[in-house]
Amino acid sequence: MHTLPAVALIREACPEADITWVINPEWAPLLRGNPDVNHVHLFPRGEFRGLGAAGTLLPWLKQTRKLRPDLALDFQGLLRSALIGKVSGAKEIYGMSDAREGSRWFYDCIAKVEHGEHAIERYLKLAECAGARVNEILRYPLPSGDPLPRFDEHPPFILLHPFARGRSKSLSNAVIEEFCRLFAPTRVVVVGQSYRKFAPPANCVELTNQTSLLQLIWLIRLAGFIVSVDSGPMHIAAAVTDRLLSIHTWTDPRRVGPYNPDAWIWKNGQLLHVSELKTAKIRRRGRRFKTKDVPFVAELIRPLVPVDPMLI
């Protein structure tokens, strides 16, 4: 997600360039119909493990060697991504100054980035090294998404994405249930990937583990408001709408929060517009989002998603 605006600016600067994007298959649907990308080269990382890894890795390396680009841009900044650039036969490899795991040794040009910068701002600096000109308007050429079968677009609903890979960033079952209860009778659609089970109230549409990435994008575009923990889907929402609240327990919203000045963030019991983050005083040490925090959030969201008269 964070790389989309950078690649869009590179395309504007180099309209005749042949751009190939190396990407993990699970995120490849984000590039469907992207006018800035000519080719998608899948990196099936999960298949390169175990006893049969060589049988998959060797053919992939052979195909990757055929790419031979004039320039490879390492937006990930890891040894693995730098090695992919090297294997591709790129004439030059550009990366960022905060790259890790020794990946900087592979770079021919290094973009100077600051520690406290947002990921998007860091990636834009790398794009500048490739000739892009950064302006205030950024493009996120996301697909429109795929409709979810048997899902009614009306009445309006709130989309809740409460799960993250880090357990400490996820919302508890009690918070999810309290969130649904406070917004009844308005529908609360719960999405995401999780093995956890919770007791969904009557107004909850429980879609955990039941949506593809493209179906999730479709739901994000339809939702009256989105509440999400710090995650990939949150960043998708930030690119689509400002009707978003991003919940940050331990992460710094200045660095990894929504890159949308009109979106909202929650941190340590505070609700702030993203545009207020530069001057706001926020405690570095975070805490979990608790059931006592739900009414505070509900006061923000309820005026934006009023109860449909047909439900009263």
Describe the function of each predicted region.
Residues 1-312:
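Catalytic machinery of carbohydrate-active enzymes
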